[in-house]
From Swiss-Prot:
Sequence ranges assigned to domain OBG-type G in this UniProt record: 23-283
Signal peptide feature range: none
A cellular component annotation (GO) from this entry: nucleolus
Presence of the UniProt keyword Nucleotide-binding in the record: yes
Keywords: ATP-binding, Cytoplasm, Hydrolase, Magnesium, Metal-binding, Nucleotide-binding, Nucleus
Cofactor annotation: Mg(2+)
Annotated SUPFAM superfamilies: P-loop containing nucleoside triphosphate hydrolases, TGS-like
Protein name, UniProt field: Obg-like ATPase 1
Protein source organism: Gallus gallus
Functional note: Hydrolyzes ATP, and can also hydrolyze GTP with lower efficiency. Has lower affinity for GTP.
Length: 396
């Protein structure tokens, strides 16, 4: 029997969320916390900094290149005419107000936009500015977090109640045994979200069948959330703000494991208008750096996305896949024929390629692997796929 290849036969744990790679992350927050400023600097700075294909889907949605030193190295090494990075789809969502779940403010429109997203950049304001009024009358980001969490939970409460009522009629009173397991799972979700008043994602032990039900309904509180704290330029540079510890304490208690990333919309806006040389000088003088690359990478990872590379003299490209994707399905991202006629994936680890300096050196070191159809592709793999070309039907 042939030895098992690395990565073969490993069962991937199911992921809560929409299946696919064209996933979106929405910027959510109360009015006047800096959402549009953040969206604009995020999209414009990345578009201006790199000569990559850039696409504004509409005024409130953009594709942002994911910064990656590995991609940059491969481009410098191969110097191809075509360079295509991975992208993060970002949506600027109108400000939420208290009572949105009942239709207050933009209410239902706001919630439908969140529903179309797969993750959330939860942006809150931690700076004072007399010229920018706060919808709640004062700056208190912890209160703002709780308002948004409660609005999303209350909308889920409404959706869960409706679903249970429908299932009860069919599965319990109607005796439909096929739907009884879904009804039981919905009752467990109800206990957690309605009785315990907690978000779906705060519970980390949903089993496979429960995740199947969650993915059928895609509740608001199941979406991964990254907490972005908008500071004044001064506070961001000195890394001090009275709210940061309180925000971190709240997140650690209620959403353990979630990222809290401070940034300064004011600083990012200032940097956007500088030349590359001016920007570098300003950052060095103030001993700081832009938070945007970290935020983009975090958003991409939160959507359970990763990418592998194809690299050569004609093109270096990052191909987006879901975590846990097997080699044939990864090949299918390039072309359906690659998946249908899949033979094997020849894989190099980026680190091995960089250290060795060439494909030949990786092979000489015995680190060039041939992987079968059960191989789970890892982030940053450099892959060459071998496949059979499907035969064309003979003309009569």
């Amino acid at each position: 029997m042939a030895p098992k290849k690395a990565g073969d036969g490993v069962k991937a744990h199911p992921i809560i969320g929409r299946f696919g790679t064209s996933l979106k992350i929405g910027i959510v927050g109360l009015p006047n916390v800096g959402k549009s400023t953040f969206f604009n600097v995020l999209t414009k700075s990345q578009a201006a900094a790199e000569n990559f294909p850039f696409c504004t889907i509409d005024p409130n949605e953009s594709r942002v290149p994911v910064p990656d030193d590995r991609f940059d190295f491969l481009c410098q090494y191969h110097k191809p005419p075509s360079k295509i990075p991975a992208f993060l789809n970002v949506v600027d969502i109108a400000g939420l107000v208290k009572g949105a779940h009942t239709g207050q403010g933009l209410g239902n429109s706001f919630l439908s936009h969140i529903n179309a997203c797969d993750g959330i950049f939860h942006l809150m304001r931690a700076f004072e500015d007399d010229d920018i009024t706060h919808v709640e009358g004062s700056v208190d980001p912890v209160r703002d977090i709780e308002i948004i969490h409660e609005e999303l939970r209350l909308k889920d409460e409404e959706l869960i109640t409706q679903s249970i009522d429908k299932l009860e009629k069919v599965a319990v009173r109607g005796g439909d045994k096929k739907l009884k397991p879904e009804y039981d799972v919905m009752c467990k979700i109800k206990t957690w979200v309605i009785d315990e008043k907690k978000a779906v994602r705060f519970y980390h032990d949903w089993n496979d069948k429960e995740i199947d039900v969650l993915n059928k309904h895609l509740f608001f509180t199941s979406k991964p959330m990254i907490y972005l704290v908008n500071l004044s330029e001064k506070d961001y540079i000195r890394k001090k703000n009275k709210w940061l510890i309180k925000i971190k304490e709240w997140v650690d208690k209620h959403d353990p494991g979630a990222l809290v990333i401070p940034f300064s919309g004011a600083l990012e806006l200032k940097l956007q208008d500088m030349s590359a040389e001016e920007k570098q000088k300003y950052l060095e003088e103030n001993m700081t750096q832009s938070a945007l690359p970290k935020i983009i990478k975090a958003g991409y990872a939160a959507l359970q996305l990763e990418y592998f590379f194809t690299a050569g003299p004609d093109e270096v490209r990052a191909w987006t896949i879901r975590k846990g994707t097997k080699a044939p399905q990864a090949a299918g991202k390039i072309h359906t024929d690659f998946e249908k006629g899949f033979i094997m994936a020849e894989v190099m680890k980026y680190e091995d390629f960089k250290e060795g300096g060439s494909e030949a050196a990786v092979k000489a070191a015995g680190k060039y692997r041939q992987q079968g159809r059960n191989y789970i592709v890892e982030d940053g793999d450099i892959i060459f796929f071998k496949f059979n070309t499907p035969q064309q039907p003979k003309k009569k």
